[in-house]
Amino acid sequence: MKIRTKNAIATHNPVIHGGKFSAGNRDPSIVDFSSNISPIGMPASVKSILKTKLSSMKDYPDLYSTDLISGLKKYTGISESNLIVGNGAIEIIYNFCSTFLSKKQVLIPVPTFGEYESASKLANCKITFFKTMNIAENFDSFISKIPRNGCVFICNPNNPTGTILSKNQLTKIILSAKHKSSFVFIDECFIELVPKSNQSVLNLVKKYDNLFVLRSLTKSFGLAGIRIGYAAASKQIIDILKKIKIPWSVNTLAQEAGIVAIKNTSHIKKSKSIIKKEFNFLKSHIDNIPNFECYDSSTNFILIKIKQDSTKLQKKLLKHKILIRDCKNFRGLNNHFIRIAIKSHKDNLKLVKVLEKIS
């Protein structure tokens, strides 16, 4: 039998991500700087609830994640009718694109998170890429490229550059897009780990019906393996997404972990404090290594420009049990960029010493 499929699927190439599995090395002793997770990992309260809830695995999960949505309402101040959860932020990205953007025009600044492009391609979108290391430096030009009856994607803070747009700048983009009947999809998965002022637009979803804000518990609470994300938007958008959402996509352990995690606000505060301190440590030391240049960052990772080949450097560091993110597969970057997560001082010190030794 000859199997036929849509051309968008036949030509689709999955996005390459960080992490030990992507690097093909599961050695538990490796210090993973390639995944941008909270430097203090998972809260102890989450570990505890996961153990106590194992007996409930015999039952189906709550189809509507009722208790988690209720908890998110208290955590964010957003009404339950304006919230939806997913099996990680990724599920929500793909559901949004397939539901609202089929064959439409989208604007994607690059370099940025690759799944916006991937999901848009599967939805047969016409993509305009806007190359910039910082949208704020090309702001008016970027706004002029917003399509009609389409969508603009913004990662804020941006992965992998670490740049962040202000709430005022984002509001201007939202208004410009609204005049063109376009969505604005803002990914705030890293915004809770920004030590400085809060530039979130989460509370604007009731004011602007073209705004869609994505969040994740993965980064802030160290829950990468559990897969739990959420989004906020107008009730109309959320109601439509609920209709096409895969049943039971958010499992019981994910729901329970999320409920407990968002009660632990001190975890976020501690993470921010470490990130602020360790960013200064890493940048000051790495910038002093010949042919290494750190970009400024608002959040828990740093993009670094290097003279040597990024893949070769990644292999060298793996010999020292250190995994970094090779950024050559980010559209808009090349094999002279790497990204590192900000981790504990002990881990950061190890990275600096090894880089100084091998460079």
What are these regions (language model features)?
Residues 1-59, 148:
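N-terminal "arm"/small-domain region of PLP-dependent enzymes with the aminotransferase-like
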Residues 9, 98-154:
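PLP-dependent aminotransferase-like
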Residues 12-16, 296-297, 304, 320-342:
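Conserved PLP cofactor-binding pocket of PLP-dependent enzymes
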Residues 64, 210-295:
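PLP-dependent aminotransferase class I/II
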Residues 65-105:
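Phosphate-binding glycine-rich loop
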Residues 133-195, 303:
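Active-site phosphate-binding strand-loop segment of PLP-dependent enzymes
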Residues 168, 319-320, 331-359:
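PLP-dependent enzyme catalytic core of the Aspartate aminotransferase-like
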Residues 275-276, 289-320:
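Conserved PLP-binding catalytic core of the aspartate aminotransferase-like
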